[in-house]
Amino acid sequence: MISIEAYRESFEEEPGYLDFAAFGPLSPAVREEAHADLEALGTGRRSGIEHVEQHVNLARELVAELIGSTAEQVTLQPSTTQGIMQALFGVTGATMVSPNEVITLPLAAQRAADALHVLTPQWLETTDGMVTPEAVRDALTPDTTALAVSLVDYRTGYRTDLSALREVIGDRLLIVDAVQGFGIVEADYQAADVVAGNGYKWLRAGRGAGFAWFSERALERLTPVFSGVTGTDVMGLPTDFVPPVSRSAHAFTVARP
């Protein structure tokens, strides 16, 4: 672990920059690794290409460490939005979501409903726009199968209590857009079933560093819809046949990052 002094010195952006909730300027470590990878990929050597490809597993392990899970349950995604859509397009039944959430959540719910007709958006109306355990409890119905929520509200900074929401919704699916707080706030991610986020804000890792974690319950209940060549259990590139979809989190991926 680096010292607090070394960590402080890694912030090289202009003095006064405070907009990490929108974009975190890339850290020196990220820039150095990116440059090194570009040089390795520029040589054409197989060893350099394979070295860069191994970073996929490392990234999954690091995300898993922050969530408190295993890397096998973590998928890398192009963005938070794609991770959320992988989850919501796989839901069947009424999914509770506030129309006041960041547009990613209500948009994904509505698009999934329009395209597949198996998810029904259950719009959660609140007086202050905050998704509290009390508001969710009052709105729950026997038809509710999932709740989609932001970890941190992007307008107010309200922090959602995932543990309390889990107590309220029981064994229903809890799908969390964590991008606004991942890496900066403590949260009980194990209370959730899907956690989607990105490294371009508080982790200072740049865009394209998205991920989605799936619990065992999520893997049992979600239907992989947007599943590509990496969504199978076949090692390497399948040829001359179409393999079945994986039963692991890989099912919710399309291609290698």
Residue ranges with predicted function:
Residues M1-P257:
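Pyridoxal 5′-phosphate
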